[in-house]
Amino acid sequence: MDLTNNLDAYLNAHLDESIAELCKLVSQTSVSAYKHGLIECSEIIVGLMKKRGFKVQIFSNDVAPIIVAERKGKSNKTLLFYNHYDVQPAEPLDLWESPPFKPMI
């Protein structure tokens, strides 16, 4: 089975779980401008990473905790993801078709 088929099989087998995790993550406010929900959001991410076998380090600062996660694979190659989990303020709320932190599928 090739990589694409393996990935498709994994995603199909874990679709409901993946959707639930994504909904939990995007439901958490993490507005950097207000420093609101950033610690809680980082805790969700840390939990998701640990669940998948990553060794996680958290570096606190005065804005949003920095999360560094590492998991050794079978090869000596490195894959790096660099991302952010904070968002911009959702206002004005009346311009939204649905609540900004309530996922809809």
Over which residues does each language-model region extend?
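N-terminal capping segment at the start of a domain
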Residues: D2-H36
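A short linear-motif detector with a strong N-terminal bias
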Residues: L3-N5, L11-N12, V46-K50, F59-S60, ...
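A non-catalytic alpha/beta surface segment that caps or lines the substrate-entry region
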Residues: V31-K77, E97-P103
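Short charge-dense sequence patches
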Residues: M1-D2, S18, S75-N83
